[in-house]
């Protein structure tokens, strides 16, 4: 059966029953149909005095077209924890329509380890992304309107930093000229679109503590600069309060369930290669009050998602992870060892051992944050006993345990061994989490620290304009912010073709952007785009409705 067929055949409980298991009354749920609901802000506020559970991060090796199954493992681990008698919840991000119709075709787990309703989660869900897109574009409209009606703030139209967004992969919108067509349409200027998941509004929603914090952060957004080079904020044109109104319900986390009827919070969705890649702080904090173990994921490999989870989300939200799981597959490590995708079905122990250095690098990096690590081998049918043994031997040689997991085929029953070991690791109290760098380190030094200690770069370079911009950010009072490096997800380097564990390479920072509301500085490297394009054969070509009105093609 395909993922969508498995999801459609699931025996789901009414969302009110899932809520009751967590102690949430029907009055504190805002249902969207029978199988999904938002949790009220008043209920979340009532949890503040409860003790926190243990926070467990699921991350992965660098992703390849062979697939790693990070979300699948995150969901499966929660099902496994509940099977062994633990009270566990999963916290994951909402999928973006862009990749759904581009290359992914869906993102809610897979096989017997999914969150449901899978179709709804992938397509519109509860409307959060629409609200974020609307709030972002309201600010864009108010900027141009402010200029049209006299430009009281003296905005320099050459230095407006706020673009528009849409939740779609559309390369034609990357760069454009707006306000053409004459005087009545405003002042023409260069602008463009980013994808919604790259929006600072998305990052703000995912890092805000509550509605008051959300409004404060929205007001701090730097929309551009005056002709005297001083910053103009969203609050200066009185946009932040109306933006908050649009985001009021989007701030409430979404409650759904796994295939095994365990509670899941699916909320927020910033990308990890062009943003910070973690689900919302509101959802994570709520789950920590409602469960003994909370399993969350961070996007792409540990060099991107895990680093940003630790250095941005945990730092800013005061979270202290108790354990980390790194997902690896035999197939992906063979690809890192030089095997072509078409040959991955054939046994090749030597290639696996060559590629395993990628896993070793990630293990070493996560340990550098003071968080204990275990490896989950996400099983594929083509894996041979010799390959699995070689991977486990390699893991043992670097002092980490690698547990074979069959959750894709067997659900929670196939991951119980990992669940027991992760629970014991989290309960041991050996975690001593520390971010990679202090707040008071200069911004460029923070970029260098991440590049050299996590990516293992030999040098970090930047044009004079980038250095000057960072100096300006520091002069404006933003020098204590963490950095969020936009980089390819496929390699430790900025070259997606450099697989394995390259070192000594150069990281060139070609642009920096201030996300004052979110609370970080974005450094853009390589060819990373904040508006992706569709591939030659987009997944949208095979997504359709069948004769019964059911969706086909999501996977």
Curated annotation (Swiss-Prot):
Keywords: ATP-binding, Ligase, Nucleotide-binding, One-carbon metabolism. ATP binds at residues 64-71. Pfam families: FTHFS. Its EC number is 6.3.4.3. GO terms for molecular function: ATP binding; formate-tetrahydrofolate ligase activity. Gene3D superfamilies: Domain 2, N(10)-formyltetrahydrofolate synthetase (3.30.1510.10), Formyltetrahydrofolate synthetase, domain 3 (3.10.410.10), P-loop containing nucleotide triphosphate hydrolases (3.40.50.300). GO terms for biological process: tetrahydrofolate interconversion. Pathway: One-carbon metabolism; tetrahydrofolate interconversion. InterPro entries: Formate_THF_ligase, Formate_THF_ligase_CS, P-loop_NTPase. It catalyses: (6S)-5,6,7,8-tetrahydrofolate + formate + ATP = (6R)-10-formyltetrahydrofolate + ADP + phosphate. It comes from the Bacteria. Belongs to the formate--tetrahydrofolate ligase family. This is Formate--tetrahydrofolate ligase. The lineage of its organism: Bacteria, Pseudomonadati, Pseudomonadota, Alphaproteobacteria, Hyphomicrobiales. The gene is fhs.
């Amino acid at each position: 059966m395909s993922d969508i067929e498995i999801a459609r055949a699931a025996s789901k409980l009414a969302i009110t029953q899932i809520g009751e298991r967590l102690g949430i009354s029907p009055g504190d749920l805002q249902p969207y149909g029978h199988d999904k609901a938002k949790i009220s802000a008043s209920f979340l506020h009532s949890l503040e005095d409860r003790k926190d559970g243990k926070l467990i991060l699921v991350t992965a090796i660098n992703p390849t077209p062979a697939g790693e199954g990070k979300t699948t493992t995150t969901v499966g681990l929660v099902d496994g924890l509940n099977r062994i008698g633990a009270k566990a919840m999963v916290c994951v991000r909402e999928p973006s329509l862009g990749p759904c119709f581009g290359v992914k075709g869906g993102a809610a787990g897979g096989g017997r380890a999914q969150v449901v309703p899978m179709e709804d989660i992938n397509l519109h869900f509860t409307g959060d992304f629409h609200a974020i897109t609307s709030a972002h574009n309201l600010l864009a409209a108010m900027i141009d309107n402010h200029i049209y009606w006299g430009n009281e703030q003296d905005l320099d139209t050459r230095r407006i930093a706020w673009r528009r967004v849409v939740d779609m992969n559309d390369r034609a919108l990357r760069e454009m000229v707006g306000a053409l067509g004459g005087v009545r349409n405003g002042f023409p200027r260069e602008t463009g679109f980013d994808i919604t998941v790259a929006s600072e509004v998305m990052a703000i929603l995912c890092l805000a503590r509550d509605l008051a914090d959300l409004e404060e952060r929205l007001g701090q957004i730097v929309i551009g600069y005056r002709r005297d080079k001083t910053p103009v904020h969203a609050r200066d044109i009185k946009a932040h309060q109306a933006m908050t109104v649009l985001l009021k319900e989007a701030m409430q986390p979404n409650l759904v369930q796994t295939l095994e009827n365990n509670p899941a919070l699916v909320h927020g969705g910033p990308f990890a290669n062009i943003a910070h890649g973690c689900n919302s702080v509101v959802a994570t904090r709520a789950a920590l009050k409602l469960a003994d173990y909370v399993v969350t994921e961070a996007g792409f490999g540990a060099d991107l998602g895990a680093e940003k989870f630790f250095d941005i989300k945990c730092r800013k939200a005061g979270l202290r992870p108790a354990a980390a799981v790194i997902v690896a597959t035999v197939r992906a490590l063979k690809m890192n060892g030089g095997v072509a995708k078409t040959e991955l079905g054939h046994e090749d122990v030597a290639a696996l051992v060559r590629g395993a250095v990628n896993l070793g690098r990630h293990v070493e990096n996560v340990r550098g944050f003071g968080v204990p690590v275990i490896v989950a081998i996400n099983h594929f049918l083509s894996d041979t006993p010799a390959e699995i043994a070689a991977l486990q031997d390699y893991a043992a040689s670097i002092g980490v345990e690698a547990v074979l997991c069959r959750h894709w085929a067997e659900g929670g029953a196939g991951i119980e061994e990992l669940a027991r070991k992760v629970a014991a690791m989290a309960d041991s109290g050996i975690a001593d989490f520390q971010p990679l760098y202090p707040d008071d380190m200069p911004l460029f030094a923070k970029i260098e620290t991440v590049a050299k200690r996590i990516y293992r770069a030999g040098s970090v370079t930047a044009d004079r304009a980038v250095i000057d911009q960072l100096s300006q950010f520091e002069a404006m009072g933003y020098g204590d912010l963490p950095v969020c490096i936009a980089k390819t997800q496929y390699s430790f380097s900025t070259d997606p073709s450099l697989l394995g564990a390259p070192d000594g390479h150069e990281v060139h920072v070609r642009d920096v952007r201030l996300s004052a509301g979110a609370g970080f500085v974005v450094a853009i490297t390589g060819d990373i785009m904040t508006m992706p394009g569709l591939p030659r054969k987009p997944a949208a070509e095979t997504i359709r409705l069948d004769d019964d009105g059911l969706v086909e093609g999501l996977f």
